[in-house]
Amino acid sequence: LPDTFDSRKQWPNCPTISEIRDQGSVSVEVSAEDLLSCCGFECGMGCN
């Protein structure tokens, strides 16, 4: 594993990756795999 990791540098074509959204009232469990599976080519296509 790397000592540091910056997703903004890894995926610069995904402008919303730096946003942190408060979804505390949603009450839905979402795994990291769920989030990554929605990412299309270089994170620009989103979920369908």
Curated annotation (Swiss-Prot):
GO cellular component terms given for this protein: lysosome
Catalytic activity: Hydrolysis of proteins with broad specificity for peptide bonds. Preferentially cleaves -Arg-Arg-|-Xaa bonds in small molecule substrates (thus differing from cathepsin L). In addition to being an endopeptidase, shows peptidyl-dipeptidase activity, liberating C-terminal dipeptides
GO biological process, one term: proteolysis
InterPro entries the UniProt entry points to: Papain-like_cys_pep_sf
EC number: 3.4.22.1
Domain of life: Eukaryota
Family in the record: Belongs to the peptidase C1 family.
Function per UniProt: Thiol protease which is believed to participate in intracellular degradation and turnover of proteins. Has also been implicated in tumor invasion and metastasis.
Full protein name: Cathepsin B
Organism: Coturnix japonica (Japanese quail)
Gene that produces this protein: CTSB
